[in-house]
Curated annotation (Swiss-Prot):
Record-linked CDD domains: STKc_TDY_MAPK
Activity regulation as described: Activated by threonine and tyrosine phosphorylation.
Catalytic activity annotation: L-seryl-[protein] + ATP = O-phospho-L-seryl-[protein] + ADP + H(+); L-threonyl-[protein] + ATP = O-phospho-L-threonyl-[protein] + ADP + H(+)
Name recorded for this polypeptide: Mitogen-activated protein kinase 11
Free-text comment on this protein's domains from its UniProt entry: The TXY motif contains the threonine and tyrosine residues whose phosphorylation activates the MAP kinases.
Domain of life: Eukaryota
Organism of provenance: Oryza sativa subsp. japonica (Rice)
Gene field: MPK11
């Protein structure tokens, strides 16, 4: 009886893929996000072997404004292909062209977001700060050269992997400008974005905007990375302006004239004179060059803020990469967003979303364009094989209450990638970080990175999770063998594996163990490995000591996160 009630209660969510094409391509693993929009599940792509995130967006046509936002986002993510922007890998084909209500969008999987990284790490280094900002600006350069303004940049909209890779996501509020003149548009989602909104937009719902608004947001995010908390957590518009002027000083009358809201402009005009605060006192121990650039990014007057390309050329990034090699994007054709320039009906939006889905089904798109398509696409249902899987993940979620990490309701979660300094062409991008990657150690050890086992000299050895306190998480541990001396592949850094063996036993031999720590080569922007030795005493001591020892022998270790089921040195 209890089972029967459970099935009735969860019937809508159990039939996760009901009637949709391509469902036999994916194996659902677990629920990783749940919100008003629907569900996000992690899954295995059986065709490629990759782990992906499948976002089910339900009842998308209930409100036309929501449908338009979804259309805008999937269209922009198709047009903006860049390593620093989250990628849509696939959109499932609905069972019927005009009778569908839900869509299933397959994203690359990322581990966390910058909000969680800032929250969980109090030991980020100058190299982390520099590389994080560089990636954000590199993405912004690409976005802005396409004449797109994100308009909702904040730490939760910047996804992160343990190899320090960042990707901008959530383009639902983005806008495309088709002239060089400032564009006036209605600004929604005001409260959620206040802390990262440029001062010229404070208190204004209809606002003119330029690329400078995104630059301000990046400055706020970078400052938050530096100090570990939001820079301007205003409770309302007046408080927001107070916090901004406490740091930057009273703006000039010319800068105040850029503020769109009459009351905000009057408040700033009548404000007592404030001197700028010392950035070196506010951001203790920060690189002086970083603070010089931050002050430019946070210029009160939008005309004084640098473009993303100008910021990339700042001395702060000297030696990191060549700015001229960082890619630009062709401006987006006006016809792609014609629906925003006219009063589109629900049927118009549905047809346009269906056309976007067909972009991921080339043969059907060809038929659609030529007019030879079938009126409806009915697919053989293979829901039964998903029913059990989805029931299980739902049962875990509802039964334990904390079986999965639901605090990050983002559409994209983990994928093992390598940081690239230049953009990857769209046709090559799918080949990055193949899931079949293996390591060769002295020609005798092959470890399957994304699995749960390793074969050492032909003998299986199980990865075990070390016993740790609730306050500390460790890396997956492999039994160390004397022949493990060389690590030849970047893929290992995704797991942050620590090697242990009899040397950890007080009675074992006092020999050094090889340990490979991932780091980012900040001159080239590529992820690399640094091999060194950690003594038995180091390993037996607190892991933070071992981490410090490792850091003193080379570049910074990879970032650590606090995700359930993820084990690493912290």
């Amino acid at each position: 009886m209890q089972t029967s009630n459970f099935r009735k209660k969860n019937a809508a969510e159990v039939d996760f893929f009901m009637g949709y094409g391509d469902v036999n391509r994916y194996e659902v693993l677990e629920v990783i996000g749940k919100g008003s929009y629907g569900l996000v599940c992690s899954a295995n792509d059986i065709h490629t072997g990759e782990k992906v995130a499948i976002k089910k967006i339900h009842n998308i046509f209930e409100h036309i404004s929501d449908a338009a936002r979804i259309l805008r986002e999937i269209k922009l993510l198709r047009l903006l292909r860049h390593p620093d922007i989250v990628e849509i890998k696939h959109i499932m084909l609905p069972p019927s062209k005009m009778d569908f209500r839900d869509i299933y969008v397959v994203f690359e999987l990322m581990e966390s977001d910058l909000h969680q990284v800032i929250k969980a790490n109090d030991d980020l280094t100058r190299e982390h700060y520099q590389f994080f900002l560089y990636q954000m600006l590199r993405a912004l350069k690409y976005i802005h050269t396409a004449n797109v303004y994100h308009r909702d940049l904040k730490p939760k909209n910047i996804l992160a992997n343990a190899n320090c890779k960042l990707k901008i996501c959530d383009f639902g509020l983005a806008r495309v400008a088709f002239t060089d003149a400032p564009t006036t548009v209605f600004w929604t989602d005001y409260v959620a974005t206040r802390w990262y909104r440029a001062p010229e937009l404070c208190g204004s719902f209809y606002s003119k905007y330029t690329p400078a608004i995104d630059i301000w947001s990046i400055g706020c995010i970078f400052a938050e990375v530096l100090i570990g908390k939001p820079l301007f957590p205003g409770k309302n518009v007046v408080h927001q302006l107070d916090l901004i002027t406490d740091l930057l000083g009273t703006p000039s009358l010319d800068a105040i004239s850029q503020v769109r809201n009459d009351k905000a402009r009057k408040y700033l005009t009548c404000m007592r004179k404030k001197q700028p605060a010392s950035f070196s006192h506010k951001f203790l121990k920060a690189d002086p060059l970083a603070l010089q650039l931050l002050r430019k990014l946070l210029a009160f007057d939008p005309k004084d803020r640098p473009s993303a390309q100008e910021a990339l050329a700042d001395p702060y990034f000297n030696g990191l990469a060549k700015v001229e090699r960082e890619p630009s994007c062709q401006p987006i054709p006006k016809m792609e967003f014609e629906f925003e320039r006219r009063r589109a009906t629900k049927e118009d939006i549905k047809e346009l979303i269906f056309q976007e889905i067909l972009e991921y089904h080339p043969q059907l798109l060809k038929e659609h364009i030529s007019g030879t398509e079938r009126p409806n696409f009915h697919h053989l249902s293979v829901v039964d094989q998903f029913r059990k899987q989805f029931t299980q993940v739902e049962e875990n979620l509802n039964g334990s209450g904390a079986a999965v990490s639901l605090q990050r309701k983002h559409s994209s979660l983990p994928r093992s990638t390598i940081v690239h300094s230049a953009a990857i062409p769209a046709k090559d991008y799918k080949h990055v970080a193949s899931s079949s990657t293996k390591l060769a150690v002295d020609g005798s050890w092959n470890a399957q990175i994304q699995g749960v086992h390793a074969n050492i000299a032909g003998e299986p050895s199980t990865i075990v999770r070390p016993a740790v306190s609730s306050e500390r998480s460790l890396a997956p541990t492999l039994q160390w063998q004397p022949n493990m001396t060389h690590f030849l592949n970047h893929a290992l850094c995704y797991q942050n594996t620590v090697f242990s063996g009899s040397l950890l036993d007080a009675t074992g031999p006092a020999q050094a163990i090889p340990r490979t720590t991932p780091y980012v080569d900040y001159r080239s922007g590529n992820l690399d490995l640094y091999q060194h030795h950690v003594s038995r005493e180091d390993v037996q001591s607190d892991t933070a000591t071992a981490q410090a020892h490792a850091a003193s022998h080379g570049p910074v270790p990879a970032v650590s996160y606090s995700l359930p089921g993820t084990y690493r040195i912290t």
